[in-house]
Amino acid sequence: MTPLVLVTNPVGAYLPPAQASLEGEWKRELLRLHGVTFDALYCITNMPISRYLEWLIDSGNLVGYMERLVAAFNPGTVDGVMCRGTLSVGWDGRLYDCDFNQMLDLEVAEAAPRHIRDFDLPRLTSRSIVVGRHCFGCTAGAGSSCGGSIK
C-alpha cells in the first residue's frame, strides 16, 4: 500500500511546532474524530515569498516574522537543506538551487552551468548557492524541507 503523508504549515506569522509531537497529536485526533490513519506528517515553514510575503507586508507582520526566522536560525539544519543536494529545473531547462529560488527567478550562480543541457556535476557540486532572506525559512528551528523538518 502507498504511504499517506500529510503536509502542514502554520496559519499566520509563526514557525511550525515540533513535527514529531504534532504528528502524534494529528494521528490521535484524526483517528478519533474521523477514523483516518496516515503514515507521516511533514511540517513546513512558510517562506517569506510570493503571496505569503504579500500577506506579511499587508498585515504588518513582515519585520516580526523575519526577526523570528533569523533568531531561530539553526546551523545544524544547513547540511540538510534542499539546495545542498537538489536542483530545480525550470520548464525551459534553466537550473535553480531550490524551488523557492525558481519561484523568485534566481538562477544558479554564474560559475555553474545555468541550463540542463550544460549539466556538469563537478561544477554544480562546487558552486556557490544563491541565497536570500527567504533562506532563513529553511534553517529556522528544526529546519524545513520537502520532507518536513530537518533536525
Per-segment meaning from a language model:
Residues 2-4, 85, 134-136:
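A generic secondary-structure signal marking the coil-to-beta-strand transition
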Residues 70-101:
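C-terminal accessory regions of radical SAM enzymes
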